[in-house]
Amino acid sequence: MFKKKLALIVLSIISIQLSAQYVDFPTQGVDLSKLNLEQFKFGIKLTPAISWLDISHNDAQADGAALKFGLGVSADYEINSILSVVSGVNFNILGGYAFDSVSLNSTNTKNNYQLTYSQIEIPLGLKLKTPEVNKMSYYLQGGVTSGFILGAKEKNKSLTNRAIPSIDMLALSTPSMVGYFAGVGANYKISSKLKLFGEITYKNSLTSVAQSDEYIATNYHNYLQPIEIRPAAMQFSVGLQF
């Protein structure tokens, strides 16, 4: 019963997200009677990450990575013994450092600043796994992601001991983003219904999270040309699958 409810919740969230991203996506309900719930595997995970920015602009430039964090619920639907459809719901914090002429010429703050974005993400992909040997199995996975941006901020560091509040950047950010992921992982079988897993996953945004028109209209950082900001990350996940 718990697995049935969890499957319904995850599938409903995926359907809502796809409906929001793609206007023509059908919105009919999910018929769980057509799905074999024994083929569903769910998991919970913690995801520390190294994240950075890809910036396209005539002034602003990326300037290094930052340590970030995430967590999530994974959902695998096993097609056969080696192939699964993978999805889930993740909360990610992404971002990195950047600099531009305004930050370089500031006399009160350091030369660069940090941009941070928080998002709810829905991945959808395929997992190809090896047979289990001595309780261990390994896999490759990849696919696409879509997500809603929940928050965005810019953080400058003072050259003195004076604290500088973060700047809310949500109004200058897009409401959603689309990207892709690819990674490797391993499972260790603890019991017949419980596995410990670890993953290394590369993620990159295909769409910019910056609303260029808003940057220019508000004269933010004196930008006169459109800016594109695409977050990326290398994630290191550990979790339990049941």
Regions found by a protein language model. Name each.
Residues 21, 73, 123-128, 183-185:
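Short, well-ordered amphipathic alpha-helices
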Residues 32, 36-40, 48-52, 77-158, ...:
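Gram-negative (and chloroplast) outer-membrane scaffold detector with strong preference
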Residues 1-27, 238-242:
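Bacterial Sec-dependent N-terminal signal peptides
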Residues 36, 63-68, 114-119, 170-179, ...:
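Short sequence motifs at beta-strands and strand-loop junctions characteristic
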Residues 29-30, 54-61, 107-114, 165-172, ...:
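Extracellular loop and loop/strand-boundary signature of outer-membrane beta-barrel proteins
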Residues 21-72, 239-241:
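Short glycine/proline- and aromatic-enriched beta-strand/turn motifs that initiate or cap beta-hairpins
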